[in-house]
From Swiss-Prot:
Entry GO CC: cytoplasm
Binding site for Mn(2+) 2: 298, 300
Entry binding sites for ATP 2: 707, 746, 748, 752, 777-780, 820, 832
Catalyses which reaction(s): hydrogencarbonate + L-glutamine + 2 ATP + H2O = carbamoyl phosphate + L-glutamate + 2 ADP + phosphate + 2 H(+)
Region (Carbamoyl phosphate synthetic domain): 547-929
Binding sites annotated in the UniProt record for Mg(2+) 4: 832, 834
Pfam families: CPSase_L_D2, CPSase_L_D3, MGS
Residues bound to Mn(2+) 1: 284, 298
Taxonomic path: Bacteria, Bacillati, Bacillota, Bacilli, Lactobacillales
Family: Belongs to the CarB family.
Source organism (scientific name): Streptococcus agalactiae serotype Ia (strain ATCC 27591 / A909 / CDC SS700)
Binding sites annotated in the UniProt record for Mg(2+) 2: 298, 300
SUPFAM superfamilies: Carbamoyl phosphate synthetase, large subunit connection domain, Glutathione synthetase ATP-binding domain-like, Methylglyoxal synthase-like, PreATP-grasp domain
Protein name: Carbamoyl phosphate synthase large chain
Function in brief: Large subunit of the glutamine-dependent carbamoyl phosphate synthetase (CPSase). CPSase catalyzes the formation of carbamoyl phosphate from the ammonia moiety of glutamine, carbonate, and phosphate donated by ATP, constituting the first step of 2 biosynthetic pathways, one leading to arginine and/or urea and the other to pyrimidine nucleotides.
Amino acid sequence: MPKRTDIRKIMVIGSGPIVIGQAAEFDYSGTQACLSLKEEGYQVVLVNSNPATIMTDKDIADKVYIEPITLEFVTRILRKERPDALLPTLGGQTGLNMAMALSKNGILEELNVELLGTKLSAIDKAEDRDLFKQLMEELNQPIPESEIVNSVEEAIQFAEQIGYPLIVRPAFTLGGTGGGMCDNQEQLVDITTKGLKLSPVTQCLIERSIAGFKEIEYEVMRDAADNALVVCNMENFDPVGIHTGDSIVFAPAQTLSDVENQLLRDASLDIIRALKIEGGCNVQLALDPNSFKYYVIEVNPRVSRSSALASKATGYPIAKLAAKIAVGLTLDEVINPITKTTYAMFEPALDYVVAKMPRFPFDKFESGDRKLGTQMKATGEVMAIGRNIEESLLKACRSLEIGVDHIKIADLDNVSDDVLLEKIRKAEDDRLFYLAEALRRHYSIEKLASLTSIDSFFLDKLRVIVELEDLLSKNRLDINILKKVKNKGFSDKAIASLWQINEDQVRNMRKEAGILPVYKMVDTCAAEFDSATPYFYSTYAVENESLISDKASILVLGSGPIRIGQGVEFDYATVHSVKAIRESGFEAIIMNSNPETVSTDFSISDKLYFEPLTFEDVMNVIDLEKPEGVILQFGGQTAINLAKDLNKAGVKILGTQLEDLDRAENRKQFEATLQALNIPQPPGFTATTEEEAVNAAQKIGYPVLVRPSYVLGGRAMKIVENEEDLRHYMTTAVKASPDHPVLIDAYLIGKECEVDAISDGQNILIPGIMEHIERAGVHSGDSMAVYPPQTLSETIIETIVDYTKRLAIGLNCIGMMNIQFVIKDQKVYVIEVNPRASRTLPFLSKVTHIPMAQVATKVILGDKLCNFTYGYDLYPASDMVHIKAPVFSFTKLAKVDSLLGPEMKSTGEVMGSDINLQKALYKAFEAAYLHMPDYGNIVFTVDDTDKEEALELAKVYQSIGYRIYATQGTAIYFDANGLETVLVGKLGENDRNHIPDLIKNGKIQAVINTVGQNNIDNHDALIIRRSAIEQGVPLFTSLDTAHAMFKVLESRAFTLKVLD
């Protein structure tokens, strides 16, 4: 079937901010889809609220709207653009839900906009739990015994009929949001209440738990001519009961017999045909390990996280082809872009094993509930490719960047057997490491299989690794054993540890013995056809398939898995850097380990190495490719942390040199640099012991800001107000040592702002200054940033520009740098300097129209700023106001406190732009799903130090029609100062009128809660914040953010005046 000619303009809805359950995979799929549609000659209009994406670059679609993905704004854009069609299946759950809302509100019908790809009825049948159940029954496809409920009472009634355990699955939510496992009525009531609240259609499916079955996924494609194929099947290491996004996954499936594979494959193809899905679809199935009995768990009628994984695992570009199918092309007429000789109708074949491992945020959220279940908790993932399971698993392990290079974590030797077995039974994020430890202690596979329901086949592969560890320990420096373990994916570092020598010795020994990796091609066809893909993975085998060209090359290191503090922004910078390298006439080589991102799309670079970002793996690529140099600036802390070892190995690091990176990161050197440049900084000291820290704090005076050196995202950063808290911090939060000093600074309460700059060694370009709405003390990544600055005087701006120039030249920066300032009493202090790309780069690139990563890369390669058209120093400010607002994933992370402070907690960001601050703020809050009505009830429960300021804030909220509720201490202060309040209790006080109940019953429209540093662990305040998060009530833990929201509400309010 030829492509459709009756449509010309197509709107694509993106997935919005990155949250747990919906990450960078949708930037990858959305970018692919937009380019695919443009390739076919269609005009593409894109709507997305996330500025950190490649998808929202001007050249990806014909028209790009970075606007809130809400019914109000998408409708306005539809009315303005009048597209012929809408493609909603590439924007994750956000895109699907928006399409449903547009349809239900009659907008699509009114504007005559057709839905492309999957029809609304199919989305409904897959997403609406009741319709899905009916369809499965019609197809004779087995599903677990279940009931659709719209109330908690109905859930209890069903539970009484069939008993526990049960699983709750809310309709139309993402990443298992609001769902969970229930072993009793109390849990059922709690989870169902939350689930009904979070489901946009107030509907949950309550089903019999089939926890313990094998979880298998099929990624399938279908076109309008009913051609359908399986792109890839995948098997979860963890059984049903743990969300697939939180599970280790292998592709292809490893333990299925031919009969089982055929059974599940047929079911998946029957389902996609019955739903008449046109495009990609993910089918999740549960298989009884002891029989051929299976159940269909769910169907995602769209491109998903698993689609991105399947695309990278096979090389088959699902989103690109789904877009072509949506406009009428069929699989048998589209050429496979990898082989360039076969058609997309050929099912991919794999001659390797892919392992995906989730990356969890518990290194930042130590208080978080680590127990895994049906609600997703991972922020990102890594993928590794090997010739056997052991190799791919160990490569994935060391890609995670959690301080491990093997299936062993520190201090496990000291764990008692009881604790070990309990950790294995509980299924937390680190269970894999405890399983390996149990095997080291000779627990049987049968025992571990019965405790975990993990297939014995996988446990046996872990045993192989453990037995090889033993073999290594008993045969020190044995070359044959070395060869054997390298074939199974052991790292040089792990071998060095077992042999009690250093990594360099293992590396040299291996190279002398000729034990070197070769690089194999990912070609979708198991080498059956010729392939032109420059997409490689390492393995210890014969025949290297990565051919070296005569062209001079540059290697760019990516940023690895998405985690809090290092998100998709760094991937954005990496992709733009590669573009500039290619434009400059070099061969661009990318090395990265993240299957979700645009940078690991094989068509972006001249060569892609899908490998862990460790010294060993990077050096192996460098030894083969011999690039002119390596660029580290765009890979976040991941790449920067490799600088020292790469430099020592004689690798040419392009851009700012190691000694200058050290001058920015090393406290004493940085202080000396600032003194020499005559730039003020808050007084501070370095401490390597607890006593040094206490002495430093006494000299500075409390409060002090304490943090470890060399971190990203404010990891383990804290404001400390007394000696007791400081001693507690030094003994629990950090392990201070001469190699890992702790930085102790005076905490200045002032206005914070930051600058991204590009330096060529002689001149600098500052695209813009961003002013933070929240005062210093809230991490810059969690602050709302405004560009251009709204309250900074000309003198302050001139000082910031002057200090930026001095620092860029003084630190010999070549390329990107980010500087953070605090302004107190009209004096500018430098807080920190990062001589690399920062997370604000995409936002600033979008709003200034300066492709910063590209300019910086060309400067790194030797170009000068005078050769560009942007001039020097501060670039002229935009006449619009732009706001970057953080987005959080607290609903997914039980026990994680939502109180903002110096340690970063946000997972994503949105942008709001308009002609003035109030309108831009309104859009930013709406895009971040922080909506407040024009009037209602607002609770104040604030720290003593904030009461004076909170009083003024409460007065203005009252002036626009809000009723002020307050807890006792706050209410007494407000009443004494002439403000009438409604007294409410915290917990256990004023039983009928305490805050969590009021929130639950919909009586409260917003909560303002600030806490002094000494009361951070206050249990009542924690529960109040948690209640607000769980019920979706706007929560402000900074008075500055609450004041910004007031400005929005005030701008929407009319003035009511009595006639004089």
